[in-house]
Swiss-Prot record:
Disulfide-bond pairs as recorded: none
A GO biological-process term: defense response
Function statement: May function as negative regulator of plant defense.
Name of the protein this chain belongs to: VQ motif-containing protein 5
Subcellular location: Nucleus
Other comments on record: Plants over-expressing VQ5 display enhanced disease symptoms after infection by the necrotrophic fungal pathogen B.cinerea.
Motif (VQ): 49-57
Chain positions covered by the region annotation Disordered: 61-80, 131-171
GO CC annotations, alphabetized: nucleus
């Protein structure tokens, strides 16, 4: 009969299982890693890495960019305070000599033109004023017209003024004469022979009592 040896139960341990093989492989990996040489690792900044790459790739060495770049700021100018009361346009005119000379020339022309016009119209205006003052005063029509050859003065408002005033007024401008001395409506006056028989004398005895006389006159 076959008898088992005494240590037969130990035969199971002689054969290793798969689990044991995996554990054995895991233990052998760190041993291999320890045997390899360690690689040197450098920790650098991103900007330093960029500059390093540029230096290595560029044909010429480039300067390193500044780290602190100043930020853009809006600089506003100070408000302008005008010390004088003259506006800017007037100050610019005063500073420009050409403009100031031209303005002085224009002002002198205006003064000369105003002075010449005043001298021309001063004398006619004085005559006109004196004539109007003379007309405003009441005068006797019998004194203004002197009697000549026994003729009586005509009772008309046309001869209220003196002959000297009429000649002086005729020297004025034509436009003023039209307003100062209005012409009569009709240049002819009709007088009855009965009313003017004593005035004209015995020369009109040959004219009948029913006939009329017409007299025309002109003003020079």
């Amino acid at each position: 009969m076959y008898q088992r040896p005494q240590n037969d139960y130990l035969r199971v341990n002689k054969r290793k299982s798969n689990y044991d093989q995996l554990n054995a492989d895991s233990n052998s990996v760190p041993q291999l890693a320890q045997t390899q040489p360690r690689v040197q690792v450098y920790i650098i900044d991103k900007n330093d890495f960029k500059s390093l790459v540029q230096q290595l790739t560029s044909p010429q060495p480039c300067d390193r960019l500044p780290q602190n770049i100043p930020k853009h700021q809006d600089i506003r100018p100070e408000p302008i305070n005008w010390t004088s009361s003259i506006p800017p346009s007037a100050m610019a005119v005063q500073e420009d000599p050409d403009v100031s000379l031209y303005m002085a020339y224009l002002q002198s022309l205006l003064e000369e033109s105003s002075g010449s016009n005043g001298d021309q119209f001063e004398e006619p205006f004085d005559k006109y004023h004196s004539h109007m003052m003379a007309q405003s005063q009441p005068q006797d029509p019998t004194q203004s017209m002197p009697q000549s050859n026994g003729f009586e003065p005509f009772p008309s408002s046309w001869f209220n003024g003196s002959t000297q005033e009429m000649h002086g007024a005729s020297s004025l401008q034509s436009t003023r004469v039209d307003y100062e001395y209005p012409l009569p409506l009709t240049p002819n006056f009709t007088f009855s022979s009965m009313t003017q028989h004593e005035v004209f004398g015995s020369d009109l005895d040959s004219i009948g009592p029913d006939e009329d006389l017409e007299f025309s006159y002109e003003i020079n």
